[in-house]
């Protein structure tokens, strides 16, 4: 086997749950930034209250673990590894979608504000001087 085939064998589509020490919104943002830049990540959900991050995609969990430890300086542990086969249950996908919706549709998103709330204020702000208000 060549090195390319070995690398492809280790990388599979999976859901991985990490236990990450997060105590404030800045910690959560830093972790989200590192995970979003990692190659192969499709979606991720951070839960600051339970100190957990669920990552879904074609990733090598050990590489992501090392990257999170190095970039954030936090204690990180792998909690669950689930490989997705052809007969994957849709319950896990639905739970992840519900978690994503609850984070975005709640009072605040994981970054402290919702995008749709900010759009209302940005339409007629002082920074957007070319905004046109036309009342028909």
From Swiss-Prot:
Lipid-modified sites (S-farnesyl cysteine): 133
Domain (HMA) ranges: 13-77
InterPro entries in the cross-refs: HIPP4/7/8/17/18/19, HMA_dom, HMA_dom_sf
Residues carrying Cysteine methyl ester: 133
Keyword entries, A-Z: Lipoprotein, Metal-binding, Methylation, Prenylation
GO molecular function: metal ion binding
Sites where the protein binds a metal cation: 24, 27
Propeptide residues, chain positions: 134-136
Family designation: Belongs to the HIPP family.
Job of this protein: Heavy-metal-binding protein.
Name the UniProt record assigns to this protein: Heavy metal-associated isoprenylated plant protein 19
Species of provenance: Arabidopsis thaliana (Mouse-ear cress)
